[in-house]
UniProtKB/Swiss-Prot annotation:
The N-terminus anchors the RBP to the virion. The central part and C-terminus probably binds and degrades the host exopolysaccharides. This is Depolymerase, capsule KL64-specific. GO terms for biological process: adhesion receptor-mediated virion attachment to host cell; symbiont entry into host cell via disruption of host cell envelope; symbiont entry into host cell via disruption of host cell glycocalyx. It is found in: Virion. Transmembrane segments: none annotated. Functions as a receptor binding protein (RBP) and probably mediates the attachment to the host capsular exopolysaccharides. Displays a depolymerase activity that specifically degrades the KL64-type polysaccharides of Klebsiella pneumoniae capsule, which allows the phage to reach the host cell membrane and bind the entry receptor. Its main location: virion. It comes from Klebsiella phage P510. Keywords: Degradation of host capsule during virus entry, Degradation of host cell envelope components during virus entry, Host-virus interaction, Viral attachment to host adhesion receptor, Viral attachment to host cell, Viral tail protein, Virion, Virus entry into host cell. Homotrimer. One of its GO terms (cellular component) is outer membrane.
Length: 1017
C-alpha cells in the first residue's frame, strides 16, 4: 500500500516485532491486523499480540498465509479522553489532550480518505491498487462489471482469441519482413502453401514465426505441417526470418543503441566515448601505463570522444601531460603515482582563448572611449563591436592597485561581456588604460569531469595532478587521495589547479587531510589540495581537506568564489579577490580564513574549530577571519557573517603569544613590502564594515573569548578600522570583557585633518558600533596611541546582557575612547569611562545615555568615571531600574555616585528590599543659619527635601523638590513650599558651587529645618 500516511503503516511479515511510528492517546485506539491480497484479520491485544514498549508491539500468532502486518490508529470520536461536562477544574493539559484527540481524528480521516476509493486528479476513481469487493453485477452499458460477468464473456469468446492474436503477430511480421524485401505468402504450415522464390516466407501459427526456404524450388507444404516435418530448420532448408530482420535493425540508424557492452552502456555509447579497456591498458597496477594513457587521450581528442573508465589501478610515472578536450569519467579508477611523479591531466577547452595586447585594435578601441571609471558596467569602446561578445574576459590594466611581498600588483578585473560592451560585473575600480585582455569563449555544452582516486603511497612530487586550463562551463565531481604521507619533505604537492576558468562547479573531492610540507630545514612550504588563479564564477562544494596543513588557496585575480558544504582547515586567498567570497555551511579548522579582498565576504552557518594542540601554536595571522598581512592586510569591502559557531581553543597559540585569537584581524606584516600607494583607487579598509548576525560559542571560556573583536595587532598603521561594526544575537560565553582594541589602525579617513576631538558632540562620528541582543560579561573600548587618536565612535548597545551568569553578573561597559555611547534595555552593572584622564588626549567629552533596562551595580558604584579638569557631561538615564547598595536611611557611596555622574529621569531605585527608595545624599539639620554639606549632583537632577516644620505646638514633615538648573553660576538655588498643617510658608535654599555640568552642594538652609536631601529620579 502507499505508505504516505501518518496513521497507517504496513510491514512485511518478516519478524515478530514491529514499530508504532505515530503517537496515540490510548492503546485501545491502536489496531493491529494481518493482511494479504485477499483477506484481512483484526488481532486482539494480549491474546494475539502484546506491547513490548509504548512504540513497539510483538506478535503472538503465526503469520502464515499473510504477507503484511498493518498497524493503524483509530481514535474514537465519541469516547473522549477528556470530559469537560463534570464541572471540574479545567487545566491547560486537558485542553492540549482534547485538541490532540481532535487532531488525531482529523489525521485518521485524511489517511482513510487517502487509502480509500477516491477521485483522482483527472476525474477517475483511484482504488490505490487494491481489490474492490462486494460489487453488484453491471446492468447498463456504463456500469462496472464483476469478475463473474467477465469470466462468462471470456468463455463465450475464448475460442476466437488465439486466432486474433495470431493474426496480429502475422501482420507485424509481414510489415517487418516487407521492410527488408521479403513477402509473407498466403497460408501457413497448418493450412498449406507453396513457396516459389527466395524472397517469400511462410507463417507458422503454432510457432509464431516466419521461415524462408533455402532448398530446391518450388517448395510445396501440405496441410498440418511444421518446419521440422517438411525439411527441417537449417541453413539449407527452413531459415528463421528473424535473423535477417535483426541484421536490418542493426544496420539501421538506431542499431548501435540495441547492442550492449560487457562493461556497461551500448555500442552507441562506445561510439561517443572510449575506455582504457579499448586499448587493452593493464589495470592491475603491475605495469607502467603512462604512455598508454597518453595514447588513449590523443585518440579521444582526435576523434572528439569522451573518455570513460570506471575501474582499475594504473601505475604512472614521469612528467606526462595528458590533454583532455572533452568529458573525462575516471570515477572508480586509481592512479598509482610513482615516486617523483610530476605529470597531470590537462583538462582544457581547445582553441577557446584569445589574448589581446595593448596595441591590438580591440584594446585601443576600449582605451579611446569611456566606460573605464569605477562603477561602469559598459565598455563604451565595444558598443559597436562584436568581437568580444559572449566571452569571459580577464582584463589587466596600467595602474598599480597595491604592493604585495615587494611586487607591484596592477589593475585587473574578471567578467563576462554579453554584447554592445555590457559587462556582467561593474568595474570595482577605474583604470587609466587596459593593457591586456584574455578572452575565453564559453563552451556550447557542459562537459563533465569525474576524477579518479590518487594513490600517493610512492611519494610523488607533483604540482597539480589535475589541471584545468582555459576552460568554461564544466562540472567536476569526485576524486580522492589515498596513502597520503603526514609530512612531505622538499615537496609541494598540489592536487587540483585551475587557471583561466569561468562558470564552473567542482564538488565531492575528498582529501583525508591536507599535506604538511616542509623544506630540508623543516620550515613550512606551500602545499595545497586546491589552487586556482584567474577564475570567475566558481563553486566548490563538499570538498574535504581538514587537518594540519594549508588546505585550499586562491592565487591571483579571482572573482566570485563560493565554498559550500566543505570541511577545510583553511580558506586562503593570496592576492585579493574581487566580487564576492562566500563560505556557506562549511567547517573550518584553526587557521580559519585568510583573504584580502576588493569585494565582499559572506560567511553563513560556518563552524570554526580553533583547537591547535597538534599545531604547535603556529598561526600566520591572529584572527579567525583575516586580511592577509603579506598582501597589505586590507579588505576593501564588507564582511557579512550569519550564524558563526566557534568551538575549541587555540591554546597553543595563546600559550606562545599570551593572548587569545581575534575574531577579525587586518594588518600588514611589513608596510614597506605590502601596502596600498596613495595613487591607488583601493581604499585601505581593514574591512569597510563587519556585520555579525549570530555568534554561537557552546563551550564556556575562562577569560575573554577574543583578544579583540576587530584587531590590528601591528605598528604598521596601514589600514582603517571598519567604519561600521554590527554584532547581533552573539553569545560570547566567556568570563571576561570582550574588547575593541583600537590600537594599530590608520588615522580614520573621516578625520583626515587630524582634528583633536575634545567634545564628541562637536564632531561627526567616524566609526559606528551597534551591539544588539548579545550576551557578554562586558565590552571594552581601548583607544589608539596619541599619534592616531582622532576617532569619534558612535556606539549603540541594545539589550546587551550577560545571560550566561544571569543577573548575578550583569554587563559592564569600559572605555577610554572618545565617543557617543547609547545603551537601551541592557542588563548593566557599571559604566567605566577613562576617556578624560590626564594622559594622552585628556579632557575629552564622551556622552552616555541609558534608556530602560536594569542597572545592577551589585555591591559597588554604578559608574567609575575618572576626569582631569572637571567632568562636563553626565550619564543621562531615563526609565532605568537601579539596583544596588542604595539606601534611604544612610548616605552610601552608590547614592553619591549616581547623583554625581548620572542625570536620572523617570528612574526607580531598589536595594535589598521590595520597596522603591530615594537615595539619601545628606542628612542633618539645615535650619535658618544653614548647615554645611559637600556632595555633587549632576545638573538637571531633581532633589527631594525632607523638611521638619513647626508652628507653635503644631509640627509637620514636608516633602519638597528642587531641580538643579542646567545653567547656573555659583550661588543659591531656592524654593518655597506651604505647610497645611502648620499653616505657613517654608523657604529653603541650597548653596551651589558650579563644577562644569555638575553642582557641588555646600550649604543646606531652611526657614524651618531640612533633615534630609535625596535624589528624586
Amino acid at each position: 500500500m502507499d505508505q504516505d500516511t501518518k496513521t497507517i503503516i504496513q510491514y512485511p511479515t518478516s519478524g515478530d516485532e514491529y514499530d508504532i511510528p505515530f503517537d496515540y492517546l490510548s492503546r485501545k485506539f491502536v489496531r493491529v491486523s494481518l493482511v494479504s491480497d485477499t483477506q484481512r484479520i483484526l488481532l486482539d491485544n494480549i491474546t494475539d499480540y502484546r506491547y513490548v514498549s509504548r512504540t513497539r508491539v510483538k506478535l503472538l500468532v503465526s503469520t502464515d498465509g499473510y504477507s503484511r502486518v498493518e498497524i493503524r490508529r483509530f481514535t474514537s470520536a465519541s469516547e473522549m479522553v477528556v470530559d469537560f461536562s463534570d464541572g471540574s477544574v479545567l487545566r491547560a493539559t486537558d485542553l492540549n489532550v482534547s485538541a490532540l484527540q481532535s487532531a488525531h481524528i482529523a489525521e485518521e480521516a485524511r489517511d482513510l480518505f487517502s487509502t480509500s476509493l477516491s477521485i483522482g486528479q483527472l476525474s477517475y476513481f483511484d482504488a490505490k491498487g487494491l481489490q474492490i469487493k462486494n460489487v453488484a453485477a453491471g446492468v447498463d452499458n456504463t456500469d462496472a462489471v464483476t469478475v463473474q460477468q467477465l469470466n462468462k464473456i471470456i468463455a463465450d469468446v475464448v475460442t476466437t482469441i488465439p486466432d486474433s492474436v495470431a493474426d496480429n503477430i502475422r501482420g507485424l511480421w509481414a510489415r517487418v519482413l516487407g521492410d527488408i524485401g521479403i513477402t509473407l505468402v498466403d497460408g501457413s504450415f497448418e493450412t498449406g502453401a507453396t513457396i516459389t522464390t527466395r524472397t517469400q516466407a511462410l507463417w507458422s501459427i503454432s510457432g509464431r514465426k516466419c521461415y524462408t526456404w533455402a532448398g530446391a524450388l518450388p517448395k510445396v507444404v501440405p496441410e498440418n505441417s511444421t518446419p521440422e516435418s517438411t525439411g527441417g530448420i537449417s541453413e539449407t532448408a527452413w531459415v528463421d526470418s528473424s535473423s535477417k530482420a535483426l541484421g536490418v535493425l542493426l544496420a539501421g540508424p538506431s542499431g548501435a543503441e540495441r547492442v550492449g557492452l560487457k562493461q556497461g552502456g551500448t555500442v552507441q555509447d562506445a561510439i561517443n566515448w572510449l575506455t582504457f579497456d579499448s586499448f587493452d591498458i593493464v589495470k592491475d597496477g603491475s605495469k607502467d601505463v603512462t604512455a598508454d594513457i597518453m595514447a588513449a587521450c590523443v585518440v579521444a581528442n582526435d576523434l572528439g570522444l569522451d573518455i570513460k573508465q570506471n575501474d582499475g589501478t594504473y601505475l604512472v610515472s614521469g612528467n606526462p601531460v595528458w590533454p583532455v578536450y572533452n568529458s573525462l569519467d575516471l570515477n572508480g579508477v586509481t592512479l598509482k603515482l610513482a615516486a617523483g611523479f610530476t605529470g597531470y591531466f590537462a583538462l582544457t577547452q581547445k582553441d577557446s582563448t584569445t589574448v589581446y595586447g595593448p596595441t591590438s585594435p580591440i584594446v585601443q578601441a576600449i582605451n579611446a572611449a569611456g566606460g573605464r571609471t569605477a562603477g561602469s558596467g559598459v565598455l563604451e569602446g565595444l558598443v559597436n563591436s562584436t568581437e568580444l561578445d559572449g566571452k569571459f574576459l580577464f582584463m589587466e590594466g596600467a595602474d598599480v592597485l597595491y604592493y604585495s611581498r615587494g611586487t607591484a600588483k596592477y589593475w585587473w578585473t574578471n567578467t563576462y561581456l554579453s554584447n554592445r560592451g555590457k559587462l556582467s560585473d561593474n568595474l570595482k575600480y577605474g583604470v587609466s588604460a587596459i593593457t591586456k585582455i584574455t578572452a575565453v569563449t564559453p563552451r556550447t555544452k557542459i562537459v563533465y569531469y569525474r576524477l579518479p582516486n590518487l594513490d600517493f603511497g610512492n611519494g610523488p612530487a607533483n604540482n597539480g595532478v589535475i589541471r584545468v586550463l582555459n576552460n568554461t562551463r564544466f562540472i567536476m565531481q569526485g576524486g580522492s587521495i589515498s596513502n597520503r604521507p603526514l609530512k612531505d619533505v622538499s615537496k609541494s604537492p598540489v592536487i587540483i589547479s585551475l587557471n583561466y576558468c569561468a562558470a564552473f562547479k567542482a564538488y565531492d573531492f575528498f582529501d583525508p587531510y591536507p599535506a604538511f610540507a616542509v623544506d630540508s630545514n623543516n620550515s613550512l612550504i606551500y602545499s595545497y589540495t586546491l589552487n586556482f588563479n584567474d577564475i570567475a564564477d566558481a563553486v566548490f562544494e563538499n570538498f574535504n581537506s581538514q587537518g594540519y596543513g594549508w588546505g585550499v588557496v586562491g592565487g591571483q585575480r579571482s572573482t566570485n568564489i563560493t565554498y559550500r558544504d566543505c570541511n577545510l582547515n583553511r580558506v586562503d586567498m593570496h592576492d585579493p579577490y574581487m566580487g564576492y567570497l562566500k563560505v556557506l555551511d562549511t567547517r573550518l579548522g584553526t587557521w580559519g580564513i585568510n583573504a584580502s579582498g576588493m569585494g565582499d565576504m559572506y560567511l553563513e552557518r560556518v563552524t570554526v574549530d580553533l583547537d591547535d594542540s597538534a599545531h604547535g601554536g603556529y598561526r600566520e595571522h591572529e584572527g579567525i577571519i583575516n586580511a592577509r598581512g603579506d598582501f597589505g592586510g586590507f579588505h576593501d569591502g564588507g564582511l557579512y557573517i550569519k550564524d558563526l559557531t566557534i568551538v575549541g581553543e587555540a591554546s597553543a597559540f595563546e600559550a606562545a603569544s599570551g593572548h587569545p585569537v581575534a575574531l577579525v584581524s587586518a594588518y600588514s606584516f611589513n608596510a614597506s613590502l605590502a601596502s596600498i600607494p596613495e595613487s591607488s583607487p583601493v581604499t585601505p579598509w581593514g574591512f569597510k564594515e563587519v556585520i555579525v548576525e549570530g555568534l554561537h560559542c557552546p563551550f564556556k571560556r575562562t577569560g575573554r573569548r577574543f583578544n579583540s573583536i576587530i584587531s590590528a595587532p601591528s605598528i604598521q598603521f596601514t589600514v582603517y578600522h571598519p567604519m561600521r561594526v554590527k554584532l547581533e544575537d552573539c553569545n560570547f560565553n566567556s568570563t571576561a570583557f570582550e574588547k575593541f582594541d583600537l590600537r594599530g589602525w590608520r588615522v580614520t579617513p573621516y578625520n583626515p585633518s587630524k582634528v583633536g576631538i575634545a567634545n564628541t558632540l562637536a564632531f561627526r562620528p567616524t566609526n559606528f558600533v551597534d551591539v544588539k541582543d548579545c550576551s557578554m560579561v562586558g565590552l571594552e573600548f581601548t583607544r589608539p596611541t596619541r599619534a592616531y587618536d582622532y576617532s569619534n565612535f558612535d556606539v549603540n548597545l541594545v539589550n546587551v546582557k550577560n545571560v550566561e551568569e544571569h543577573s548575578l553578573s550583569p554587563f559592564t561597559l569600559y572605555t577610554n575612547q572618545c565617543g557617543r555611547y547609547n545603551l537601551v534595555g541592557c542588563g548593566l552593572q557599571q559604566i567605566v569611562d577613562k576617556s578624560m584622564t590626564s594622559g594622552e588626549r585628556a579632557n575629552r567629552r564622551s556622552t552616555f545615555s541609558v534608556t530602560g533596562g536594569t542597572w545592577n551595580s551589585l555591591s559597588g558604584n554604578p559608574t567609575d568615571i575618572t576626569y582631569g579638569n572637571g567632568y562636563d557631561i553626565p550619564v543621562v538615564a531615563t526609565g532605568v531600574m537601579f539596583v544596588g547598595p542604595y539606601s534611604q536611611t544612610e548616605v552610601t557611596g552608590a547614592n553619591l555616585n549616581v547623583a554625581e555622574f548620572v542625570q536620572a529621569s523617570g528612574c526607580k531605585f531598589l536595594s535589598s528590599g521590595p520597596t522603591y527608595i530615594q537615595p539619601l545624599l545628606w542628612s542633618g539639620a539645615g535650619g535658618p543659619t544653614g548647615a554645611s554639606a559637600n556632595f555633587n549632583v549632576a545638573r538637571g537632577n531633581t532633589l527631594g527635601l525632607n523638611i521638619s516644620a513647626v508652628n507653635g505646638e503644631t509640627s509637620q514633615v514636608i516633602a519638597a523638590t528642587l531641580v538643579i538648573p542646567q545653567g547656573f553660576s555659583t550661588g543659591p538655588a531656592a524654593g518655597t513650599t506651604y505647610g497645611f498643617t502648620v499653616e505657613k510658608n517654608i523657604n529653603y535654599q541650597l548653596g551651589l558651587n558650579a563644577r562644569s555640568l555638575k553642582a557641588n552642594v555646600g550649604l543646606v538652609r531652611c526657614s524651618d529645618t531640612i533633615t534630609g536631601v535625596y535624589l528624586n529620579a
